[in-house]
């Protein structure tokens, strides 16, 4: 049974569990996601005409641009990749070519589909793995290779019946032992026994060696050509039955799934639901004022990205991928440049513009306590492992938020990431002393926050280096 797609309101509610504020950005991505579902219900003729409305997010670092896109991808189960515009160079220069973003998207899609298919056959794979473990625990009798007397086959020589009977009896005994062992295995009595398993040796691929050189596609093609000629190396590893089950289940699951089918589905899902998040797009915009050779290079990257965003066909090892219906979300702080500094053709490909707000003191308070993975909850869980119950008074939380806000105002504004630095500084001594502390409950008060952070926060020079 297929999951019912989320409505825009439900998507925003889910995002609220992890990201504070930024309602305009959440609405924009929620509508973009829902439009994909709406498009899937159209007839084929009209479906091809409806293209996704790409989104341009503008706002300082640390306000939730990347997190919104990442959470959206998780909610929809869509292939998602985050790339940085500054990593690319225009065609003809050393560096990554822009088509590699589409190849990366397809690789992500393949991993997603493979994982889904492996989950579908997990039960059968685990059953096969358990059978292999039983055979490892009770090995069979080694077969005699070759014929002792080469003339036996010509003169009717064969093993005496007595030997045949003994061999049959031995096989029956082994089978009986295996049945008993399988029963014990099912009861979980053999989990800590050791077995020796043959596993494939992981070796660096040609693709890994050429990563970042702009020659990834050549590396993948060479790897595919050579993999059929060279057998995969195996090595013997001693491990517990518990570990062996995981390794063998993965091996058995891989045998049960059709990788050609996975590749085809992956290409289709990348084309229909893929999301590419292009970060730091403002860094390839032309800066206002006099032009320079750097501006020419930046413009070259923009012109290379343009056909991918417009819709083109990129050849990957799984087949040709059309980017016409891939959703592109671009983001940048736009401190030095403006969206209008991008080339007009690229601007036109991002019709939805969303400005994310700077974080206020109240936002910082909410970030500390509201999300499911809130920072304070993380620190409380970490210290709970040492037997310490850590509490924060409301006034202390407000004080931490104020310090974060003012340090951002006085130095560089790094958004919510400032809280990581401040909390590390605040709880540094406590984390160090935690194993030796006898108190079961510790409450952080505003006085403690002032003592640890007050002087540093007020001194601009110190703030720049420490917080």
Swiss-Prot record:
Pfam family for this entry, one: AAA_2
GO terms for MF: ATP binding; ATP hydrolysis activity; peptidase activity; proteasome-activating activity
Domain of life: Bacteria
Subcellular compartments: Cytoplasm
Biological process annotations from GO: protein unfolding; proteolysis involved in protein catabolic process
Keyword Cytoplasm: yes
InterPro entries according to UniProt: AAA+_ATPase, ATP-dep_Clp_protease_ClpX, ATPase_AAA_core, Clp_ATPase_C, HslU, P-loop_NTPase
Coiled coil start-end: none
Residues reported in the UniProt entry to bind ATP: 20, 62-67, 279, 345, 417
The entry's keywords: ATP-binding, Chaperone, Cytoplasm, Nucleotide-binding
Recorded GO CC terms: HslUV protease complex
Keyword 4Fe-4S part of the UniProt annotation: no
Family of the protein in this entry: Belongs to the ClpX chaperone family. HslU subfamily.
Matching PANTHER family: ATP-DEPENDENT CLP PROTEASE ATP-BINDING SUBUNIT CLPX-LIKE, MITOCHONDRIAL-RELATED (PTHR48102), ATP-DEPENDENT PROTEASE ATPASE SUBUNIT HSLU (PTHR48102:SF3)
The protein's name in its UniProt record: ATP-dependent protease ATPase subunit ClpY
Gene designation per UniProt: clpY
